[in-house]
Swiss-Prot record:
InterPro entries per the UniProt record, alphabetical: KOW (IPR005824), Rib_uL2_dom2 (IPR014722), Ribosomal_uL24_CS (IPR005825), Ribosomal_uL24_euk/arc (IPR005756), Ribosomal_uL24_KOW (IPR041988), Translation_prot_SH3-like_sf (IPR008991)
Family label: Belongs to the universal ribosomal protein uL24 family.
Bridged cysteine pairs (disulfide): none
Function: One of two assembly initiator proteins, it binds directly to the 5'-end of the 23S rRNA, where it nucleates assembly of the 50S subunit. Located at the polypeptide exit tunnel on the outside of the subunit.
UniProt keyword terms in alphabetical order: Ribonucleoprotein, Ribosomal protein, RNA-binding, rRNA-binding
GO function term, MF aspect, one: rRNA binding
Subunit structure comment from the entry: Part of the 50S ribosomal subunit.
Pfam families linked to this entry: KOW, Ribosomal_L26
A single cellular component GO annotation: large ribosomal subunit
PANTHER family the UniProt entry points to: 60S RIBOSOMAL PROTEIN L26 FAMILY MEMBER
Keyword Transmembrane: no
Signal peptide: none
Protein name: Large ribosomal subunit protein uL24
Amino acid sequence: MSEVIEMVSKQPRKQRKARYTAPLHIRQKFMGARLSEALAKQYGTRSAAVITGDTVKIMRGDFKGTEGKVQSVSLMDGTIAVDGVISTKVDGTEVPRPINPSNVMITKLEMKDGRRASSIKK
């Protein structure tokens, strides 16, 4: 079984390459977002990984202030799609606008998964 070697380089090109070539179980760690003040106090942690079904508030960008449920999470792109956050293509079709999870705040957690509940509570 191969081990994941920790990143030791300071070079930006190697930092970027490590992110782009990371396996999916490592990319999951890049999908963290801040918890709202109430959730942070309740669970005793400041952040959690975003999953489908969470309710998030967008904190940065064109859709700042928009709140909606997470439709999908793309580990390959490192983005999430949120209800009500859409772009219109030239032909008129609407597509979900990809959002970086670092630009959102989780306001309500989807707790159907028991393992998630135990991993968030500390």
